[in-house]
Amino acid sequence: MNYPHPIIAREGWPFIAIAAVVALLIHAVGGFGLAWPFWLLLVFVVQFFRDPPRAVPTQANAVLCPADGRIVAVETAHDPYADREALKISVFMNVFNVHSQRSPVDGAVQKVEYFPGAFLNAALDKASAENERNAVVIQTGAGHTVTAVQIAGLVARRILCYVRAGEPLSRGQRYGFIRFGSRVDVYLPKGSRARVSIGEKVSASSTILAELPEQP
């Protein structure tokens, strides 16, 4: 299980440093009685930016979960990024989940599109169309198209994506991060079979979301 990233995500290092300095300064001036809420805040920030390695299933037609969280949608829907009817599976991340995003399949990035938008509660269905979001369209070696959409939430105001069109992605590979609560929508080819249900807790990479059909 090779995961070449720090167990505490780099995206969080500045926030952790600021929280630690503030806690230390207040502790030095007013003691633990005054500083304990800031130490608690530091613990929260550290846990928010944790980014542990995960086991990656090897099943050939498996679509892996791109994020930790809870399933809030499993439905047939239009994929506006690949202009097709698709199976849509949505994962909602609260502030206690790991917030890095990992590729659901092996493939090549066909396009990356960013859309500015609102910051509604990411658990709501309308967040898919109205919130700030970033779509990554991936084509597998077998010719299947898989779309993964990072969606900002009520608190999240910063979507980070580290891949560009033409670049390869491996299943389980870390490709993005959303700070402070968010959602990821995955659009799959018609004929894909969902392996999760609404309300189910899922883990990035190690949970199989769905199985792709044999033919594109």
Swiss-Prot record:
Catalytic residues as annotated in Swiss-Prot or TrEMBL: S182
Pyruvic acid (Ser) PTM positions: S182
Principal subcellular localisation of the protein: membrane
Localization per record: Cell membrane
EC number: 4.1.1.65
One Gene Ontology molecular-function label: phosphatidylserine decarboxylase activity
Membrane topology: Peripheral membrane protein
Annotated InterPro entries: PS_Dcarbxylase, PSD-A
Site annotation Cleavage (non-hydrolytic): residues: G181, S182
Cofactor(s) needed for function: pyruvate
Cofactor remark from the record: Binds 1 pyruvoyl group covalently per subunit.
Enzyme class, first EC level, given as a word: lyase
UniProt keyword Iron-sulfur present: no
Keywords per UniProt: Cell membrane, Decarboxylase, Lipid biosynthesis, Lipid metabolism, Lyase, Membrane, Phospholipid biosynthesis, Phospholipid metabolism, Pyruvate, Zymogen
GO cellular component, one term: plasma membrane
Post-translational modification: Is synthesized initially as an inactive proenzyme. Formation of the active enzyme involves a self-maturation process in which the active site pyruvoyl group is generated from an internal serine residue via an autocatalytic post-translational modification. Two non-identical subunits are generated from the proenzyme in this reaction, and the pyruvate is formed at the N-terminus of the alpha chain, which is derived from the carboxyl end of the proenzyme.
Function (record text): Catalyzes the formation of phosphatidylethanolamine (PtdEtn) from phosphatidylserine (PtdSer).
Family: Belongs to the phosphatidylserine decarboxylase family. PSD-A subfamily.
Protein name: Phosphatidylserine decarboxylase proenzyme
Annotated organism of origin: Burkholderia mallei (strain ATCC 23344)
Gene that this sequence comes from: psd
